[in-house]
Amino acid sequence: MARLAAFDMDGTLLMPDHHLGEKTLSTLARLRERDITLTFATGRHALEMQHILGALSLDAYLITGNGTRVHSLEGELLHRDDLPADVAELVLYQQWDTRASMHIFNDDGWFTGKENPALLQAFVYSGFRYQIIDVKKMPLGSVTKICFCGDHDDLTRLQIQLYEALGERAHLCFSATDCLEVLPVGCNKGAVLTVLTQHLGLSLRDCMAFGDAMNDREMLGSVGSGFIMGNAMPQLRAELPHLPVIGHCRNQAVSHYLTHWLDYPHLPYSPE
């Protein structure tokens, strides 16, 4: 029996309309009744996730910013990781050959240089939104991550530029087909889940995890039971071909699987 369940949000727990379904909420409550520790492991900001947990009265640990922050049930900061100031400066000041929009995160929020209302659709559930700033005046010493949002092919070309400029000084990953992230070296959900399990006196073998994108790769590959969403990025399936694939987030597939796991633990599971 798993003792901790870790969930990605977008494309995993959240439905395509960016809401948590009633079946999902009911299943999360059932897990807590079984004393299974809940952990939300997401690229979203800690401020947003703390607001969501408060609104839902859910007790859960938070891995946010794709591993840049870890918070306890009480909101205590357990782990932090920031981009080195020189890396942040290079990424912010360089003229990249891309049409993608740039987004900067620190403990105070989400910042960008231009209005982009379409991006806010993903935050209708929480109301979280960006703040418009002069990017060149951003304090460099407290940047947690920098994201580029745009067309996937354009971002793939940008990824090559970033690799050439940064070398091994940052970790690059796609958190979605339209979002490329620049993170601190060694920063990923799997690495910080290790930190959290050690804090809780657990091992990764005691954990199950669910995800859909390349920012979930290390987490899914390191836990005792990792599950890939049916709507996952093809690259994730290719990287972890041995892991089971469940249904689509639009059908609340995580809830569907966990309901079976709770009620019929000894029977084989089918996502149909």
Swiss-Prot record:
Cofactor: Mg(2+)
Its EC number(s): 3.6.1.-
A single MF term (Gene Ontology): phosphatase activity
Catalysis performed (reactions): 4-amino-2-methyl-5-(diphosphooxymethyl)pyrimidine + H2O = 4-amino-2-methyl-5-(phosphooxymethyl)pyrimidine + phosphate + H(+)
Active site positions: 8
Cited Pfam families: Hydrolase_3 (PF08282)
Keywords, alphabetical: Hydrolase, Magnesium, Metal-binding
Chain sites annotated for binding Mg(2+): 8, 10, 212
PANTHER family on file: HMP-PP PHOSPHATASE, PTHR47267
NCBIfam families: Cof-subfamily, HAD-SF-IIB, PRK15126.1
Function description: Catalyzes the hydrolysis of 4-amino-2-methyl-5-hydroxymethylpyrimidine pyrophosphate (HMP-PP) to 4-amino-2-methyl-5-hydroxymethylpyrimidine phosphate (HMP-P).
Family to which this protein belongs: Belongs to the HAD-like hydrolase superfamily. Cof family.
Protein name (record): HMP-PP phosphatase
Organism for this UniProt entry: Escherichia coli O81 (strain ED1a)
Gene name tied to this protein: cof
